Amino acid sequence: MFYWVMKRIFLGPVLKLLFRPWVKGLDNIPADGPAIIASNHLSFSDSIFMPLMVRRPVVFLAKSEYFTGTGIKGRLTALFFRLTNQLPMDRSGGAASAASLTAGMEVLLHGGLLGIYPEGTRSPDSRLYRGKVGVARLALQAGVPVIPVAMIGTDKVQPIGKRLPNIRRIGMIFGEPLDFSRYRDQAEDRDIQRKVTDQIMFELMRLSGQEYVDEYAAVVKLRLAGKAVEPAAAAEPLASPAADAGRGETSPGASQGTPQDMRKADDGGAAAAG
């Protein structure tokens, strides 16, 4: 009830008036049934603007720190996330992260829309970073489509560290649903999970126009903060870009570059395979 009232009566109309969001591809969201909405992550405000424009309720996996804040701001943030039915995502790995994904699975099993940020954290510099395989595990185990969505300009509205937002227009592009049902009997195969995740990231790169960086955003943040990076944090192998070239399934690749560069590489790989 609180979610509906805030979205339709109070917060939603005000945000639409101030930020005038433009949207493409909204019809790619199914009218009913479960699906994963996989988004790039530029700003805290992504979790506000994107559900605002989707007609159906979207339950997001949000970092657990949002639910444990202290002080007035921290408590208000925690209250907001709870009242809007968001789920805490423990990003420490292991059993804690697995439990968070189980909660996300429950949303899908009940026919809901689950929002997830494959990068696992906000981009530190507006580029698109390597996706974590949790999104693939959920999609394969639940047998649901993945709808990629590119958030545009939210990093300019509320950059990391900025308390008050800048008033400017933002946008979002919803891509066509990605169907991975052919891999459902291989849901626990790590190589398949990596391959599926890479395809999702490729679509996000294509839709957003962001430069892709083949490294985890969390690792880059640690480095920028001057903290030591554990080798295991960046050791996960990337699926081969040419592995499924004949079927058009392409990894973002093992290097960084523009979406145009990646598409050229994709075309070349497909031609070689033929």
Located regions from the model:
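Alpha-helical membrane-targeting segments
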Residues: 1-20, 70-85, 163-169
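Non-catalytic C-terminal accessory region of glycerolipid acyltransferases
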Residues: 2, 98-274
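A generic local structural motif
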Residues: 9, 21-26, 46-47, 74, ...
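Short, basic, glycine/proline-bearing loop/turn elements
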Residues: 10-12, 83-91, 118-122
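Catalytic core of membrane glycerolipid acyltransferases/transacylases, capturing the structured
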Residues: 16, 29-94
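Short gly/ser/thr-rich secondary-structure transition/capping motifs
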Residues: 16-23, 96-98, 155
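Secondary-structure boundary/capping positions in well-ordered alpha/beta enzyme cores
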Residues: 21, 56-57, 87, 111, ...
